[in-house]
């Protein structure tokens, strides 16, 4: 019998009980934690390689998040009936976990680490993201791998002016905010949020609230860590060669300082490369056996120090701007002739070509996740081709970064999108990043707002986004507006804010150091507001409201109402009627159970014809009305005549003509068009018709 020694920690977290268990499952991993919040359970495993691959100059951390359909009691769809490549949602959750844990590994640690989070049980009211992050923090903390945790995580909602900790899926429906925050005991590390244009102080309050509440998580993980008591790896950061550091400083500092006064990105990069190569060649000439990777790393550190020192000392930024200045803007709407909406947004050396395509309800994205099925009418896809940074590279399916940036831009815009009742179209945005030097996701937000307006989508107001940075040395700090790519890499915090003039719609924050106070975040958000309003002013000069009409190339959706009981008549046997309608009129027709019919076509005449035929099919037979009918069958006692699609009536032999009719075929033949008057509709729905009464002889006596 295998002996297991489970160690369990449980605590109340908001409205849920969280349980962390280790020692039973996956015991060959460096650490494994079964983490539960209510009935939502994830298995988190951590494995790290004990030895570093020689020559590696980066930290190979991999976070894999996988949702198993059995967790929700489902069998996967598709031919193979098993889970395949990660969905967009799984990719986003993996990134959400990766971002706060990555900066907690010590500098110089380059051993491979893999974290695998498997969702094994799910309550449809409790999303797995928060418990996945808590489980990851716990597993890393007890693994023995060098890790400066533990880390806490919380989700914050905002309903009726009050914050809610870890709201359920149902509570989020009424929430004006969905904010995820992760951090250590003393510092916030990561924020990801979507909001309904909330003020800066409400957003900052949510960050502080979430960080305060997650202290209970951190304490529980510390207790678990103490009880497991696994020895920490005997690892220390490689000692720095101070002699080499001094030589590199002498060889390259002046040249790098000069190079970073060149404002054009490509020219600056070229000169930085010249300075670095010259320093490297000089060092290798002196010592041919010198470690080139170590030299490259120290040159990178010197480069970072030079740029940060310039900013902290109050000198102009890399491209000559002051800290709160936004780069030059060039904004155009309606740049492509056949797309439904388009824009070209340029901010300095960052540029996005954004298109908007309108479709019908059937074009909406249908998503079947373990949390249930739902439809997404608004899609935003972000593409980052290698030419945007002057490089060659692979082109194909979107990478994790592209999916993450697209979702951030989607969050920024979603709050201003019209409802299905206001605008019954599916909307797909594609942002092609054609140039990049920082903040391409926020350029996508601005370009999307412009393209939507150009397409005639009635969004509530314009939305702009801005990326902010921060450089902090001791008590001195500088907040930077509209950061360049270099400032992003060399800074201590980067955060992206999207919003309207009234408030924030999306906030993403990644903090690399401790000591970022609430006051610093307050200053940064205030500076971001000023930059956002400046960009909105420029955007509004290009287009300040949605066009009065949609593009002539877009499908026009016309909505009519029919009796819900008539839906089956419009569909027809096996869908024959609606199929014929769509093929013969060239329209797209969608039916709702409540009798709403949406007809989409870029041809107005085709739409009118489809409506006419639907109205014919669904029309009620009215007693006393004269119809143009067609004879469909002749019998001994009369003829059956179609007066409306699917509606036949009988003209009795006595109602065909004034004179006596001996043989129906002498007067009528199949296919003949005749005028008939509806005399009666009985309880069974049978229709009695008369040709005599429809004849233009008002004075003629009625037939008995």
Swiss-Prot record:
Residues 555-614 form the KH domain. Residues 624-692 form the S1 motif domain. Its EC number is 2.7.7.8. One of its GO terms (biological process) is mRNA catabolic process. InterPro entries: ExoRNase_PH_dom1, ExoRNase_PH_dom2, ExoRNase_PH_dom2_sf, KH_dom, KH_dom_type_1, KH_dom_type_1_sf, NA-bd_OB-fold, PNPase. It is found in: Cytoplasm. Its cofactor is Mg(2+). It is an enzyme of class 2 (transferase). Keywords: Cytoplasm, Magnesium, Metal-binding, Nucleotidyltransferase, RNA-binding, Transferase. One of its GO terms (molecular function) is magnesium ion binding. It catalyses: RNA(n+1) + phosphate = RNA(n) + a ribonucleoside 5'-diphosphate. Mg(2+) binds at residues 488, 494. CDD domains: KH-I_PNPase, RNase_PH_PNPase_1, RNase_PH_PNPase_2, S1_PNPase. GO terms for cellular component: cytosol. Component of the RNA degradosome, which is a multiprotein complex involved in RNA processing and mRNA degradation. Belongs to the polyribonucleotide nucleotidyltransferase family. Involved in mRNA degradation. Catalyzes the phosphorolysis of single-stranded polyribonucleotides processively in the 3'- to 5'-direction. PANTHER family: POLYRIBONUCLEOTIDE NUCLEOTIDYLTRANSFERASE (PTHR11252), POLYRIBONUCLEOTIDE NUCLEOTIDYLTRANSFERASE 1, MITOCHONDRIAL (PTHR11252:SF0). This is Polyribonucleotide nucleotidyltransferase. It comes from Shewanella pealeana (strain ATCC 700345 / ANG-SQ1).
